[in-house]
Protein backbone atom coordinates (compact mmCIF):
# COMPACT_ATOMS: atom_id res chain seq x y z
CA UNK A 1 0.00 0.00 0.00
CA UNK A 2 0.98 3.63 -0.51
CA UNK A 3 0.59 6.47 1.98
CA UNK A 4 0.69 9.96 0.51
CA UNK A 5 -0.04 13.64 1.06
CA UNK A 6 0.99 17.13 -0.03
CA UNK A 7 1.19 20.40 1.88
CA UNK A 8 1.73 24.02 0.81
CA UNK A 9 2.37 26.89 3.23
CA UNK A 10 2.81 30.59 2.55
CA UNK A 11 6.20 32.14 3.36
CA UNK A 12 6.55 34.97 5.83
CA UNK A 13 7.93 37.36 3.18
CA UNK A 14 4.64 37.06 1.31
CA UNK A 15 2.67 37.51 4.51
CA UNK A 16 4.57 40.74 5.22
CA UNK A 17 3.95 42.04 1.69
CA UNK A 18 0.30 40.97 1.78
CA UNK A 19 0.89 38.75 -1.26
CA UNK A 20 -0.92 35.50 -1.90
CA UNK A 21 0.84 32.15 -1.82
CA UNK A 22 2.39 31.39 -5.21
CA UNK A 23 3.07 27.70 -4.59
CA UNK A 24 0.47 25.05 -5.34
CA UNK A 25 0.29 21.32 -4.66
CA UNK A 26 -2.14 18.49 -5.18
CA UNK A 27 -2.45 14.74 -4.82
CA UNK A 28 -4.55 12.18 -6.64
CA UNK A 29 -5.09 8.52 -5.87
CA UNK A 30 -7.10 5.71 -7.42
CA UNK A 31 -6.79 1.93 -7.65
CA UNK A 32 -3.98 2.17 -10.20
CA UNK A 33 -1.97 5.28 -9.41
CA UNK A 34 -0.87 7.89 -6.89
CA UNK A 35 0.14 11.36 -8.10
CA UNK A 36 1.75 14.18 -6.08
CA UNK A 37 2.70 17.67 -7.30
CA UNK A 38 4.67 20.70 -6.09
CA UNK A 39 4.63 23.85 -8.22
CA UNK A 40 6.23 27.23 -7.51
CA UNK A 41 4.90 30.35 -9.20
CA UNK A 42 7.71 32.81 -9.95
CA UNK A 43 8.12 35.81 -7.67
CA UNK A 44 9.37 38.39 -10.19
CA UNK A 45 7.24 41.45 -10.80
CA UNK A 46 6.33 40.43 -14.37
CA UNK A 47 4.75 37.16 -13.18
CA UNK A 48 1.55 38.78 -11.97
CA UNK A 49 -0.52 35.59 -12.22
CA UNK A 50 2.06 33.03 -11.17
CA UNK A 51 -0.23 31.81 -8.37
CA UNK A 52 -2.60 30.70 -11.13
CA UNK A 53 0.21 29.38 -13.30
CA UNK A 54 1.31 27.01 -10.53
CA UNK A 55 -2.26 25.78 -10.09
CA UNK A 56 -2.62 25.23 -13.83
CA UNK A 57 0.70 23.34 -13.94
CA UNK A 58 -0.46 21.03 -11.15
CA UNK A 59 -3.84 20.46 -12.79
CA UNK A 60 -2.23 19.86 -16.19
CA UNK A 61 0.24 17.23 -15.03
CA UNK A 62 -2.39 15.37 -12.97
CA UNK A 63 -4.78 15.35 -15.94
CA UNK A 64 -2.15 14.05 -18.36
CA UNK A 65 -0.73 11.41 -16.01
CA UNK A 66 -4.24 10.10 -15.35
CA UNK A 67 -4.47 9.21 -19.05
CA UNK A 68 -1.39 6.97 -19.04
CA UNK A 69 -2.33 3.31 -19.56
CA UNK A 70 -0.47 0.23 -18.37
CA UNK A 71 -0.48 -1.03 -21.96
CA UNK A 72 1.52 2.04 -23.03
CA UNK A 73 4.61 0.50 -21.42
CA UNK A 74 4.29 -2.49 -23.76
CA UNK A 75 3.39 -0.52 -26.88
CA UNK A 76 6.00 2.24 -26.66
CA UNK A 77 9.57 2.76 -25.55
CA UNK A 78 10.22 4.77 -22.39
CA UNK A 79 11.71 7.54 -24.54
CA UNK A 80 8.54 7.75 -26.64
CA UNK A 81 6.35 7.78 -23.52
CA UNK A 82 8.41 10.59 -21.98
CA UNK A 83 8.30 12.68 -25.16
CA UNK A 84 4.54 12.28 -25.50
CA UNK A 85 3.96 13.17 -21.86
CA UNK A 86 6.21 16.22 -22.18
CA UNK A 87 4.24 17.55 -25.13
CA UNK A 88 0.83 16.79 -23.60
CA UNK A 89 1.67 18.47 -20.28
CA UNK A 90 2.87 21.66 -21.98
CA UNK A 91 -0.11 21.73 -24.35
CA UNK A 92 -2.52 21.26 -21.44
CA UNK A 93 -0.91 24.03 -19.39
CA UNK A 94 -0.84 26.44 -22.32
CA UNK A 95 -4.49 25.69 -23.11
CA UNK A 96 -5.46 26.56 -19.52
CA UNK A 97 -3.47 29.80 -19.67
CA UNK A 98 -4.96 30.79 -23.04
CA UNK A 99 -8.49 30.06 -21.78
CA UNK A 100 -7.95 32.17 -18.67
CA UNK A 101 -6.49 35.06 -20.68
CA UNK A 102 -9.45 34.92 -23.07
CA UNK A 103 -11.87 35.08 -20.16
CA UNK A 104 -9.95 37.63 -18.10
CA UNK A 105 -7.19 39.54 -19.86
CA UNK A 106 -4.49 41.35 -17.89
CA UNK A 107 -5.96 44.42 -16.20
CA UNK A 108 -4.33 47.83 -15.78
CA UNK A 109 -4.29 47.28 -12.04
CA UNK A 110 -2.28 44.06 -12.39
CA UNK A 111 0.45 45.68 -14.51
CA UNK A 112 0.47 49.17 -12.99
CA UNK A 113 3.80 48.57 -11.20
CA UNK A 114 5.69 47.43 -14.32
CA UNK A 115 8.23 49.54 -16.20
CA UNK A 116 7.50 50.32 -19.85
CA UNK A 117 10.07 47.75 -20.96
CA UNK A 118 8.60 44.96 -18.83
CA UNK A 119 5.06 45.91 -19.80
CA UNK A 120 6.02 45.68 -23.48
CA UNK A 121 7.55 42.22 -22.92
CA UNK A 122 4.44 41.04 -21.10
CA UNK A 123 2.12 42.30 -23.84
CA UNK A 124 4.24 40.46 -26.41
CA UNK A 125 4.05 37.23 -24.38
CA UNK A 126 1.17 37.46 -21.87
CA UNK A 127 1.65 33.82 -20.85
CA UNK A 128 4.73 35.00 -18.93
CA UNK A 129 2.36 36.36 -16.30
CA UNK A 130 1.71 32.73 -15.32
CA UNK A 131 5.36 31.62 -15.01
CA UNK A 132 5.90 28.63 -12.75
CA UNK A 133 8.01 25.59 -12.04
CA UNK A 134 6.58 22.08 -11.97
CA UNK A 135 7.60 19.00 -10.00
CA UNK A 136 5.44 15.88 -9.99
CA UNK A 137 5.63 12.14 -9.48
CA UNK A 138 3.27 9.26 -10.19
CA UNK A 139 3.48 5.76 -8.75
CA UNK A 140 1.83 3.54 -11.35
CA UNK A 141 2.04 -0.14 -10.47
CA UNK A 142 5.74 -0.94 -10.34
CA UNK A 143 6.64 2.19 -12.31
CA UNK A 144 7.50 5.68 -11.07
CA UNK A 145 7.07 8.59 -13.48
CA UNK A 146 8.94 11.78 -12.51
CA UNK A 147 8.33 15.22 -14.07
CA UNK A 148 10.27 18.44 -13.46
CA UNK A 149 10.99 21.87 -14.88
CA UNK A 150 12.74 24.59 -12.90
CA UNK A 151 14.06 24.50 -9.36
CA UNK A 152 12.80 22.44 -6.46
CA UNK A 153 12.94 18.75 -7.19
CA UNK A 154 11.71 15.19 -7.37
CA UNK A 155 13.65 13.06 -4.89
CA UNK A 156 13.93 9.28 -4.74
CA UNK A 157 13.93 7.71 -1.27
CA UNK A 158 15.45 4.30 -0.52
CA UNK A 159 16.64 2.86 2.80
CA UNK A 160 17.19 6.26 4.38
CA UNK A 161 19.12 7.64 1.42
CA UNK A 162 17.94 10.17 -1.14
CA UNK A 163 18.84 11.00 -4.74
CA UNK A 164 17.56 13.47 -7.30
CA UNK A 165 15.29 11.71 -9.77
CA UNK A 166 16.24 14.20 -12.48
CA UNK A 167 19.55 16.01 -13.01
CA UNK A 168 20.00 19.57 -11.79
CA UNK A 169 19.63 22.26 -14.43
CA UNK A 170 22.72 23.95 -15.78
CA UNK A 171 23.27 27.40 -14.31
CA UNK A 172 21.00 29.97 -15.92
CA UNK A 173 21.55 33.68 -16.49
CA UNK A 174 21.11 35.85 -13.35
CA UNK A 175 20.26 32.78 -11.27
CA UNK A 176 16.83 32.46 -12.88
CA UNK A 177 15.04 29.14 -13.27
CA UNK A 178 13.48 27.35 -16.20
CA UNK A 179 9.75 27.84 -16.51
CA UNK A 180 6.57 26.47 -18.02
CA UNK A 181 6.04 29.87 -19.65
CA UNK A 182 9.16 30.03 -21.81
CA UNK A 183 9.01 29.35 -25.54
CA UNK A 184 11.50 26.47 -25.37
CA UNK A 185 9.95 24.82 -22.31
CA UNK A 186 9.83 21.50 -24.19
CA UNK A 187 13.64 21.43 -24.16
CA UNK A 188 13.76 21.84 -20.37
CA UNK A 189 10.79 19.83 -19.10
CA UNK A 190 12.43 16.63 -17.84
CA UNK A 191 10.66 13.30 -17.50
CA UNK A 192 12.12 10.01 -16.29
CA UNK A 193 10.63 6.60 -15.56
CA UNK A 194 12.00 4.38 -12.77
CA UNK A 195 11.20 0.92 -11.44
CA UNK A 196 9.42 1.66 -8.16
CA UNK A 197 10.02 -1.85 -6.82
CA UNK A 198 13.59 -0.75 -5.98
CA UNK A 199 12.46 2.30 -3.96
CA UNK A 200 10.73 3.13 -0.68
CA UNK A 201 9.11 6.34 -1.83
CA UNK A 202 9.31 9.63 -3.67
CA UNK A 203 9.26 13.27 -2.57
CA UNK A 204 8.36 16.41 -4.50
CA UNK A 205 9.15 19.88 -3.18
CA UNK A 206 9.76 23.49 -4.10
CA UNK A 207 13.06 25.30 -3.54
CA UNK A 208 11.60 27.19 -0.57
CA UNK A 209 11.74 23.93 1.37
CA UNK A 210 15.19 22.71 0.25
CA UNK A 211 17.14 25.98 0.43
CA UNK A 212 17.04 26.49 4.23
CA UNK A 213 18.89 23.18 4.70
CA UNK A 214 21.81 24.32 2.48
CA UNK A 215 22.85 20.77 1.46
CA UNK A 216 21.10 17.59 0.35
CA UNK A 217 22.77 15.66 3.18
CA UNK A 218 21.37 18.05 5.77
CA UNK A 219 17.98 18.00 4.05
CA UNK A 220 18.01 14.19 4.22
CA UNK A 221 18.98 13.95 7.89
CA UNK A 222 17.03 16.90 9.31
CA UNK A 223 13.90 16.69 7.17
CA UNK A 224 13.41 13.62 4.96
CA UNK A 225 14.28 10.93 7.52
CA UNK A 226 12.13 12.40 10.34
CA UNK A 227 9.24 12.95 7.92
CA UNK A 228 9.43 9.34 6.68
CA UNK A 229 9.28 8.08 10.26
CA UNK A 230 6.34 10.34 11.10
CA UNK A 231 4.34 9.37 8.01
CA UNK A 232 4.81 5.66 8.77
CA UNK A 233 3.49 6.37 12.28
CA UNK A 234 0.50 8.26 10.88
CA UNK A 235 1.57 11.59 12.40
CA UNK A 236 0.48 13.76 9.48
CA UNK A 237 -0.74 16.57 11.74
CA UNK A 238 2.78 16.96 13.13
CA UNK A 239 4.20 17.02 9.59
CA UNK A 240 1.62 19.59 8.56
CA UNK A 241 2.48 21.86 11.49
CA UNK A 242 6.21 21.56 10.85
CA UNK A 243 5.91 22.52 7.18
CA UNK A 244 3.83 25.56 8.16
CA UNK A 245 6.60 26.55 10.60
CA UNK A 246 9.23 26.28 7.84
CA UNK A 247 7.25 28.76 5.74
CA UNK A 248 6.39 31.17 8.53
CA UNK A 249 9.48 31.06 10.78
CA UNK A 250 12.35 28.73 9.91
CA UNK A 251 12.88 29.15 6.17
CA UNK A 252 14.08 31.96 3.94
CA UNK A 253 10.67 33.62 3.70
CA UNK A 254 9.61 31.81 0.54
CA UNK A 255 6.47 29.72 0.17
CA UNK A 256 7.12 26.04 0.87
CA UNK A 257 5.59 22.93 -0.66
CA UNK A 258 6.19 19.29 0.14
CA UNK A 259 4.64 16.07 -1.10
CA UNK A 260 5.44 12.44 -0.38
CA UNK A 261 4.22 9.06 -1.57
CA UNK A 262 5.71 6.13 0.33
CA UNK A 263 5.24 2.41 0.71
CA UNK A 264 3.80 1.28 4.02
CA UNK A 265 5.24 -1.56 6.07
CA UNK A 266 8.86 -1.02 5.02
CA UNK A 267 11.84 -1.47 7.34
CA UNK A 268 12.59 1.82 9.11
CA UNK A 269 15.94 0.86 10.64
CA UNK A 270 17.97 2.93 8.17
CA UNK A 271 15.72 5.98 8.74
CA UNK A 272 16.53 6.02 12.46
CA UNK A 273 20.31 6.30 11.99
Where do the PLM segments sit?
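N-terminal entry segment of metal-dependent catalytic domains or homologous docking segments
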Residues: 1-67, 152, 184-186, 191-193, ...
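PP2C/PPM family metal-dependent serine/threonine protein phosphatase catalytic domain
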Residues: 5-19, 107-127, 131-132, 156-197, ...
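Short acidic-glycine loop/turn motifs at beta-strand connectors
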Residues: 29-32, 139-142, 150, 157-161, ...
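Short hydrophobic beta-strand that contains or immediately precedes a catalytic carboxylate
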Residues: 36-40, 147-149, 203-205
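Short helix/loop capping segments that flank catalytic or ligand/cofactor-binding pockets
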Residues: 46-47, 147, 156-157, 212-214, ...
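Helix-loop-helix
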Residues: 59-101, 217, 221-245
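Catalytic core of PPM/PP2C metal-dependent serine/threonine phosphatase domains
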Residues: 74-155, 189-196
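C-terminal catalytic subdomain
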Residues: 176-273
Amino acid sequence: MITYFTKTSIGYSHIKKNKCCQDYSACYHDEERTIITACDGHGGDIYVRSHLGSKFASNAVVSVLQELERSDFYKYSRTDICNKLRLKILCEWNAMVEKHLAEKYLSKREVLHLSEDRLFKLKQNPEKAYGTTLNAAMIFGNKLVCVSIGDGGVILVRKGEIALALPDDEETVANTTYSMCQEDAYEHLKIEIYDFSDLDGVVVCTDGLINPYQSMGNFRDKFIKPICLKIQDGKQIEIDEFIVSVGEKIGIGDDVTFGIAMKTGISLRSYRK
